[in-house]
């Protein structure tokens, strides 16, 4: 019978047959003195957040705190956003929230919106149009319709609600004023459910189109759409776990 053994050292844990050892990567801590490059390689998805903070590549062996200071980014906020983005179970506490800069957070969220609207959607549309044209009348208009619904739902929330209602309200609070016509609890109940539109679109791309219609392009665009959807979900988590409770603290501090 194969024997199992547990070995512990400073870098790895193993639990495996004596002739087969499984090595598990030690998790990089989300801390100020962690090397910035190590944090990025811990979760590659964090790389796409850097332009939203105005942080470029070429950070060498500098720490998170050093890179943030160079780029005039609040270090606590940067680490908090990375932690929420990477670990959906993480919820910062009141003391942690009070250390961040809300102006930096709004700038980050607005930059995320520009990324979605100016880069991701145009990229997807360019490639999706080739597939729509190849589908013919049976599936092309339907695929285009579900994509348009998906995009409009996203735009309705981030461009017309967050940019025109929520963010101006928060900026008013930061200016020391309070309006009785709105509070942040309304924001919690206004996240749109776009999953149905996304499911319909993905069903056409993956299940119902004939297999010989641009299969490689369909796989690539499906991955792009799923990546965007995942990013948007994590964006919502950042708003729910950081923005909303922080603004609640501001509201409660107002007379």
Label the predicted regions.
Residues 15-255:
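Small-residue-biased structural context
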């Amino acid at each position: 019978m194969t024997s199992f053994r547990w070995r512990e050292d400073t870098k790895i844990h193993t639990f495996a047959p004596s002739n087969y050892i499984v090595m598990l990567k030690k998790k990089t801590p989300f801390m100020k003195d962690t090397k910035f490059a190590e944090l990025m390689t811990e979760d590659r998805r964090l790389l796409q957040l850097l332009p939203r903070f105005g942080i470029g590549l070429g950070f060498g062996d500098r720490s998170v705190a050093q890179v943030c200071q160079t780029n005039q980014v609040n270090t606590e906020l940067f680490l908090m956003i990375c932690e929420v983005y990477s670990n959906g179970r993480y919820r910062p506490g009141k003391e942690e929230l009070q250390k961040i800069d809300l102006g930096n957070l709004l700038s980050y969220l607005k930059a995320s919106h520009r990324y979605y609207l100016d880069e991701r959607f145009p990229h997807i549309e360019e490639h999706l149009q080739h597939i729509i044209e190849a589908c013919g009348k049976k599936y092309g208009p339907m695929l285009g319709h579900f994509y348009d619904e998906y995009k409009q739902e996203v735009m309705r929330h981030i461009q017309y609600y967050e940019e025109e209602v929520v963010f101006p309200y928060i900026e008013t609070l930061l200016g020391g004023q309070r309006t009785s016509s709105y509070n942040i609890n309304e924001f919690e109940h206004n996240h749109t459910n776009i999953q149905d539109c996304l499911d319909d679109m993905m069903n056409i791309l993956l299940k119902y189109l004939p297999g010989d219609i641009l299969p490689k392009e369909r796989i690539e665009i499906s991955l792009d759409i799923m990546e965007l959807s995942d990013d948007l979900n994590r964006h919502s988590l950042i708003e729910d776990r950081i923005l909303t409770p922080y603004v609640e603290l501001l509201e409660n501090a107002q007379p």
